[in-house]
């Protein structure tokens, strides 16, 4: 995806308020992998309540579209499939119509969102040209990333492996409250 698809996070934009931070090709390659895997896993960590998960995905897709001033055909097709799925999982059509997304579905959707973030923030022809700053796209998935960072922080402070499963995810709190 990075090499053939031209999905390399090279220009990070003006992170500290000055000029753009531009990474070398190899550092950008590693940083892209880190970001895509991180966002993918962050979405996987909120998949415990399907309606909550799909609302976060819809918000991310709408955010991408607003920031980039365009609706891509792939993004529109994705939203057209996701909106009925979300309605079904809200229980508006009855409990028997709910669909479990599972790990693979959540990871595929997270990967799709992460790839779209990279594609809208990078110009494959001119590294210095950025239509959307990468840091702006992070606001589209703020709750998802904050949940992941919070869970990692709790695991580190408890001296646990960040890869162990637990009930620290935000959807467990909602489930415990009866949602």
Show the residue positions of the predicted features.
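Cytosolic, membrane-interface loops and tails of multi-pass inner-membrane proteins
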Residues: 95-96, 149-178
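Short helix-to-coil transition segments within interhelical loops
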Residues: 48-49, 177-179
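"…together with the soluble PPM/PP2C metallo-phosphatase catalytic core" -> "…together
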Residues: 1-148
